[in-house]
Each structure stands twice: as structure tokens, then as C-alpha cells.
Amino acid sequence: MSAEKKYYAVMLVDDNEIDNLINQKMIEASGICEHIFIHSGARSAIEFLKNIEKLAKGPVSLYLPEIIFLDIDMPLMDGFQFLEEFDKLSDSIKNHCKVVMLTSSLNPQDMNKAKKNQFVLKYINKPLTQENLKKI
């Protein structure tokens, strides 16, 4: 990893492809990471994390995203259901990955629920900005 990169990888989990594209460009412009993994569903993101653990050659932490930007309102599995499934993953994954809720939800109940979750580092309202990225 080059010296100026803060993270090896981050992951975007959002069902809105346009939001994913905008957030990808914002993260690329910030230069905070080497890799960006993008998932349009929470289920595929969980499967991705499980597969890294199964297929990793060497320490799992070499392949995992350090930050997961997670939307709340998604079909099939929402952000909070993702967090429930995330809690079932191995300690090596849970200890390495931190979750940033990146959502358009202004519901105070969502914010409180997210902040009470041990895996959630921050709660950010969309859009993602360079200023927000600097604070992570």
C-alpha cells in the first residue's frame, strides 16, 4: 500500500447504482484507498466477505475492506439486517471492518439504532463529501 493511501480497500453497499457511481468517484478523488468494492445488495456484500475468508491465502486482513459504507433502505436485506448478518461473521472480519452508515434516512430512530451498534463507526447523511471522508 502506498504511503498516501489511508486504507487498502473500502466497500460501498447501496442498491442505488447512481449513488454507488457518485460515491466511487468521490472516494477515488480523495485517494484514501487502493481498492473500492461495490455491491448493489447487502446479501452479496455479506457473501463477498465470507468468500474472502474462505479463499484468502494468508491473513484475511490483507484482502478485507477496512471501511464499509452501508445504506439503510435496500430491498431484500436492509442495512440493519446486514449488521445482524455481519455479527455472525468471524472475529477476524468483524475486528477488521468498520461500518459507516451512508444513507438518505433522516429518521432519528435509524440514527439512534445505528449509533448503538458496536460495528458502526459513523452515521453520515448522503451525499458523501470530501469533508466526510477526511473525518473517517
Can you annotate each of these PLM segments?
Residues 1-11, 17-32, 61-64, 125-136:
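Non-catalytic signal-transmission and effector/linker regions of two-component phosphorelay proteins
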Residues 38-51, 79:
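Helix N-cap/capping motif at the beta->alpha junctions
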Residues 74:
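Receiver (REC) domain active-site loop signature in two-component systems and cognate sites
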Residues 25, 81, 94-100, 105-122:
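Alpha4 helix (beta4-alpha4-beta5 surface) of REC/receiver domains from two-component response regulators
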